[in-house]
Amino acid sequence: MRVLDEIAESPFLISPLNPNSTANGYRWVDKCHGFLHNTVLVAASLFFVAYLAYEAKKSLSKLSNRRSYIMIAYYGCLWLVSLLNLAWCCLQGWECTPGKEVVWNLLTLFTTSGMLFLEVSLVAFLFQGNYASGAEALTRTFLISGFIVALDLLLKAIFLFGFGVPLFIDNNENGKTFKWGLWIIHKLLLTGVYGMVFLMYNSRWREKLPARPAFYNYIIIMFALYSLYLVASAFTANNAHFGFWLYGIMSVCYHALYLPLLYITFLADFFQEEDLNLENVYYSEMKDAGFFDSDWE
């Protein structure tokens, strides 16, 4: 335990929130968690939004060709959540700015709820087997996701604004044990869900899930992420500095890398398949027009 605490206190690693940093005249990028923490978050989220914007015209064209209701809705949700996440990453200084507690809590609440909605939607989609494009499949997926996320958001709002539990502000020591107990339960539930899907992929029930390596790798990554989140929450609840440091690392990884991972897992294959379909169409049209007749002579 002592070795872990020494690692967590290293000046080269992401530091815990410093409530006095706003009084030192630092720039916004240095506030609260430090330069490294904020720079990684802003750079990663900004790069991903820029990539989405760069590919937007091509992506919208492919979505309109396939007319998949699920993909169109999911792509729109991804854009909305990506912009929310970018705002959250850029406004890290609000976490330790007096008078910004309420607006920071609201921003964090809606950002994390949006990301959780994408997570739950993808898991719900996995249980439907292959790609579905009907309005019924879209409605069923989003109803399940919406109900779970609405319940999660409601409970967090009650603890935040009803009981004053500082779920998203780490420099407030009031209710610390209770706060981290809530996070342990939250991460335990998510770890359990991904663990269950992982076991299904390695059992006779795997035939009910999409036979795509990308989905399997996604489940492994998310299971590992929430397992580490759970360990970090348990350490922090027991006043171990290592736990707080590890939780910060996992938070950076989640907000910086989750949305790109989701895009690669769920949407990139869809767009790639559309390219292959278009190539097959072009090939068929050229073959019908006699472009390849000389090859048979």
UniProtKB/Swiss-Prot annotation:
One of its GO terms (biological process) is G protein-coupled receptor signaling pathway. It is found in: Membrane. InterPro entries: TPRA1/CAND2/CAND8. GO terms for cellular component: membrane. It is a multi-pass membrane protein. Pfam families: Tmemb_40. Glycans are attached at N20. It comes from the Eukaryota. Signal peptide: none annotated. Coiled coil: none annotated. The keyword NAD does not apply. GO terms for molecular function: G protein-coupled receptor activity. The chain crosses the membrane at residues 34-54, 70-90, 107-127, 142-162, 180-200, 215-235, 242-262. Keywords: G-protein coupled receptor, Glycoprotein, Membrane, Receptor, Transducer, Transmembrane, Transmembrane helix. Belongs to the UPF0359 family. PANTHER family: PROTEIN CANDIDATE G-PROTEIN COUPLED RECEPTOR 8 (PTHR15876:SF11), TRANSMEMBRANE PROTEIN ADIPOCYTE-ASSOCIATED 1 (PTHR15876). G-protein coupled receptor. Plays a role in plants and microbes interactions. This is Protein CANDIDATE G-PROTEIN COUPLED RECEPTOR 8. It comes from Arabidopsis thaliana (Mouse-ear cress).
